[in-house]
Amino acid sequence: MAPSAEILCIGTELLLGQIVNTNAQFLAVELAKLGIPHHFQTVVGDNPGRIRLALDIAIERAGIILTTGGLGPTDDDLTHQTLAEHFEVPLVRHPALLALIEERFRERNRPMSPTNAKQADLPEGAQILPNPMGTAPGIVWEPKAGVAILTFPGVPAEMRAMWAETAVPFLRLRGGGQEIFHSRTLRHWGVSESTLAEKVEEFLRGVNPTVAPYAGNGEVKLRITARAAGIAAAESLIAPVEASLRTIAGLDCYGADEDTLASASAALLVRTGTTLAVAESCTGGMLAEALTALPGASRYLRGAVVAYANDLKTSLLGVDEQRMIDHGAVSEPVARAMAEGVRNRLASDWGLALTGVSGPGGGTAQKPVGLVHIALAGPGETRAVEIRLGAQRGRDWIRRVSTQSALDLLRREIINWEAFGIMKER
């Protein structure tokens, strides 16, 4: 059986919540790919005593310890110094490593501070874990029988490069797991976690593969995880479960893994050879940004209009002024007029529009913060939906979820139009 691993992330900024700990997430996924079990993650500040305490605990329960952070040149970068003190060995300066660090500074035409020299000081007996992107090398060290320590800088890009080039080969040679864990994540929109869990309850009791639901930012994910001798074997276990789950979810499932509602909608536009124009008010360009962030957006996106002011809704989109007086700018009739106007004026097949109250101010009893109207004009009738998101989660969340909801409306209607030649009611 492969030794288990523990992830030890060092940095006071992590404890204070100033930086999101993406390194731990990355390492957890990579360990699973290698079939190396890991049961604990620890975050500790830049304090030698507490780092040593965390090491003591980790050594008792794991044979592989992966640390991130604390490899820089400043006084609070203490990882290698603390490791050396903990195992009672001296720090040894590596002249070749120091020369490499100096060369990095010359390449960047920057002066090297004397404090950077300490990055060439490593615990005696440790092997250098090269950093192809920065000046902070890590180490691969087996300070005692049954314990391997690998250190990485806290900068995610540097840590990932070092992981792929040096750490993975070392861990594979060390034995890796006889089995690997492989996952597929199905992504859903327009359904609650509890409702989806009820529909797939039978699969949640599975053992291999397992199925686990989790929700966030308006969407629900189903993670299917298989344990097998290799990726191909794991895929063969996942495939039939994935097919069944997709059938049960129907249109609520929009993709898997790295798919987004924007990419799913874009793929449908490309497949159907149709074009899109968008008109935004409350989202302020977020919908257009989601679409243009994808390569090849010019194939399907005609353009976008951000019309915040009411007079611009009239002059740019052709929304009748009296309609806004009668119904208000945040209303279904205005959303419909915006969608139809942008479709006509930008000569696109589809026109998608949003208008709403993002907050924190501007809401009323009749039109509270979080009220958003979305409309889609297309080859058939114009469709409109109203969503109420509440004010509790804040302006940015309302704008992001509104954007995703608009893309979901577009996705569903294109699928219906492609299948039936008409736009169907949801």
From Swiss-Prot:
Taxonomic superkingdom: Bacteria
Pfam families with a match to the protein in the record: CinA, CinA_KH, MoCF_biosynth
InterPro entries registered for this protein in UniProt: CinA, CinA-like_C, CinA_C, CinA_KH, Competence-induced_CinA, MoaB/Mog-like_dom_sf, MoaB/Mog_dom
SMART domains: MoCF_biosynth (SM00852)
Family that this chain belongs to: Belongs to the CinA family.
NCBIfam families on file: cinA_nterm (TIGR00200), PncC_domain (TIGR00199), PRK00549.1 (NF001813)
PANTHER family: NICOTINAMIDE-NUCLEOTIDE AMIDOHYDROLASE PNCC, NMN AMIDOHYDROLASE-LIKE PROTEIN YFAY
Protein name (record): CinA-like protein
